[in-house]
């Protein structure tokens, strides 16, 4: 074992005493750990401050990142293709004397482009009559918005027509928004059903009132289906007459005045005449009430054809619900 240690010492070149004295070229160890590296000096990473300063200076001179270095656009002049939105300046008078505010605002560099645009088309001594011609020549308004040629005229025409139509609607006392949206008169069959429900009149073959959890069914059947079902009740006879009238004289129904009465279909109404009279006449539908309206294909097509497509899905915009 001692021979092995001596051989190792010889291979390393000298004894430990010579190493401690520093006679060899290798520096002494900083720690007692034999695997530790030999440190000549502390090599810390130095951040290249000079290189970064040079890069920032070059970027500022190039003007690519002006929005980063100048966040408030008051220290830099924007390029000509960038639109500048500012308050409209008062026009210079015929004598050439401008307001004090105009002279103060002309100091800002961001508003020079708009002044040049105004000065290209209008002389500095323009009067109030020349301002209309100036507005027609320029494609944008004084506040910076883009003009559309026939936009305001279309708005004024539509507003005048809508105001006249709203006046006519207000003269006829309309109590519900759904009736205001409907442009066709109320169908006869619906009038018959709602009037019979409001009076509490029930057909002779009256079914028992629905249970607590059931949904009441209001049947609006056409003439063909009512004839095929057997003996017609007064309500079905009225429905058949209304459908026949709608078939033959559909053009005359358009000339009738618009009926603007409120339609209430209450789920709490009972089929008995005694209870039906006091079943909340004129009572609106609550959120917990449900009404199922059963219609034939002909009636459905008629209602869908005469109902204007208001906002939403047209098949679900029932005008009476």
Curated annotation (Swiss-Prot):
The molecule here is called Uncharacterized gene 45 protein
| Biased amino acid composition, Basic and acidic residues | 50-59, 179-189
The taxonomic lineage of its organism, from the top, reads:
Viruses, Duplodnaviria, Heunggongvirae, Peploviricota, Herviviricetes
Q: Where is this region: Disordered?
A: 1-59, 71-289
* Gene that encodes the chain: 45
Show the ranges annotated as biased composition (Acidic residues): 99-115
Compositionally biased, Low complexity: which spans? 156-175, 231-242
Q: Where is the composition biased (Basic residues)?
A: 1-12
Q: Which organism is it from?
A: Equine herpesvirus 2 (strain 86/87) (EHV-2)
